[in-house]
Amino acid sequence: MNNCKNRQRAAVAAAGVLGILLLAAPEAAAEGFASGTALCLASVLPALFPFFVVCELLTAAPPPARLLRPLQRLLGLEAPEAAQAVALSWLGGYAVSAQLAGRLYGTHRISRRDARRLLLLGCCSGPGFVIGCLGGLLLGRLQLGVLLYAAQLAANLAATACLDLFSASGRPSRAFSAARPAPPAPPQTAGLPCAISSAVSASLSVCGCVVFFRIVGAVIRSFLPVPPLLLSAALEISAGCADAAARGGQAALYGCCAVLSLLGLSVWSQIQLFSGDAFCPRALLVSRVLHFFFLQGLIRLCVRFLPGSLAVCSSLSARVVPISRLPPDAALLGFAFLCAALYKVRQNLYNK
């Protein structure tokens, strides 16, 4: 009880301090809001919104158990739904993983153990961000992005295996398949419109976290002499990777690895928001610390086998990306998302 009261008091105090800082530095807050909104339109929404729609459609139908059985056995999962969710998480990223864990566990389609393993195995950055943005744009080599993406999945597997050695919850529960209730039948209204509506809500939640922590970072930076890399890495993963890549040399590569492992407060907030009762903070924290060491070791081991010289590890200044119009595909997707969001708001107001 005392711990709960202390947490509430700390949260109230932090909210009060943040409110004062926002009033004292409105320009910095506006700058953070603008950068967060631009990030959401340029990369977050194109990367996550389609995967949220696909996940809604796939989880509404029974999974292909026979096709998923090899992956299910390899990962030590009890239900084929969990194996399908892990595969989708590796493509969609941590937000998809948390959303699927919370939904499947909340509807009793997977056990507590499977929900925990889903978060540990599926909590990663998607290939669009790691390969395209981080490897191709920030680090300057697409091969490095592919290596980072594969290495972070391998680090997830290694960290989960280590936790299984010291945790009784890592052992399969034979009674789950017989004891769990039958999965509820999907509602009659389930389909593409409902999937899009749910994906809009999830995407707005993700964008809200990104914009909020961008504002917090901009405001704190205007008052405190905090190193930009430490602040951005602690708050938001994309800003942390951008600041790490700007350092050049080997610090760019291994700094990005550290940011990918520790995630940042924005990602932790999204995971807690979407996973609900399936959220396991202690196990996930230990897993991410182990992930940090495994990923650093794997990159040091594998980067020497890449063909050619390591161009990313140069001391040149960071690439300047000028502000310009969005690409046509990103602009079209952003327009469609805004239309869907406005339609949903109008529908909610009309129903009231």
Question: Predicted segment positions?
Answer:
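Alpha-helical membrane segments and immediately flanking helix-loop junctions
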Residues: 75-139, 231-246, 254-275, 286-289
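C-terminal transmembrane helix pair
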Residues: 98-99, 108-114, 128-129, 157, ...
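Transmembrane helix-loop junctions in multi-pass membrane proteins
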Residues: 23-34, 59-64, 132-134, 142, ...
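Hydrophobic alpha-helical segments involved in membrane association or supramolecular assembly
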Residues: 43-60, 205-218, 252-270, 290, ...
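Selected transmembrane alpha-helices and immediately adjacent juxtamembrane segments
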Residues: 13-28, 33-45, 49-53, 150-226, ...
